[in-house]
Amino acid sequence: MYSINRLLSITIGNNRSYFDVQYVNIAMLVWGCVFCLIAGVGMILSKNFDRRKRLWMILLQFATAVLLLSDATACIFRGWTGIFGYWIVRISNFIVFLDNNIILYLFHRYVCSFIFTEQEERTLKRATFINILCAVAVALVIISQFTDLYYYYDAQNVYHRSEGFIISIFIPVTGMMVEMSFLIEYRKKLSNITISSLGSYIILPIVAAIIQFYFYEISLIDIAICNSMIVMYITVIGEQNRKLDNLEQKQIKTEAELEISMVLNQCIAELTTEADINI
């Protein structure tokens, strides 16, 4: 039975600095996964949300949790030889690439839930473009499993990028730019804090993708996606609390006005009665 230190040592080799980087990477991925699971469950238990927004937020959190767990698993078992190591590394990396595109689609639906009705969403050309783009991206991930389009493995079962890896980055970035066009065009329908939180999913992963071309050891893109999910979750909870507070204040105001109205009616009734008696 391997201890966790022994497991990580086998996975990342004997280089101490590389070990430290990978240990931090795995820890961030696992804790990010835990947070997204908690956020997803929290949204399930919360009932005071718009139905569409709540659905897509739940799916986004769980999809991100799967992404982070798969990436952590791929890191832990990198370099394992044998049947188990062979399959676990391949399945994990496949899910990572596949899930990135699924999350883009879910994010698109989440953005649309803020701006459009379901009927309006179906008629948008850009929405159709995103749907097609995500379908093509998923198809390419499947094809890459047989052609080494995005990545390949050496004899030690270690993952390496292929020349076509840039395609796996270009497709999501294209989709994110389309989503940014929605946020800019329909910004008057959104609060500033909502625009900022939704924009974090676009800006953070793009910045992370640029950095990751030069800093290969940490899963910066996936961590950036996780951070954006944290921002979106905190924002949606804050916005909902603000709306509930406004409703509570309106209810208090309405009750006060009703009480004043009842007192006035009672006073008028008493004055009318006294006038009738005097007559």
Feature locations, PLM:
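Membrane-interface interhelical loops and short amphipathic "cap" helices
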Residues: 10-18, 78-90, 152-157
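Alpha-helical transmembrane segments of polytopic membrane proteins
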Residues: 23-34, 90-101, 160-173, 222-230
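PAS/LOV and related PAS-like sensory modules
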Residues: 253-279
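Membrane-interface helix-boundary motifs at transmembrane edges
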Residues: 44-58, 112-126, 183-194
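Hydrophobic alpha-helical transmembrane segments of multi-pass membrane proteins
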Residues: 2-6, 28-110, 128-146, 198-213
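Interfacial "cap-and-anchor" motif at the non-cytosolic start of specific transmembrane alpha-helices
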Residues: 5, 182-250
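Membrane-proximal helix-loop-helix units in multi-pass membrane proteins
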Residues: 106-109, 115-174
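First transmembrane helix
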Residues: 13, 17-49, 58, 168-183
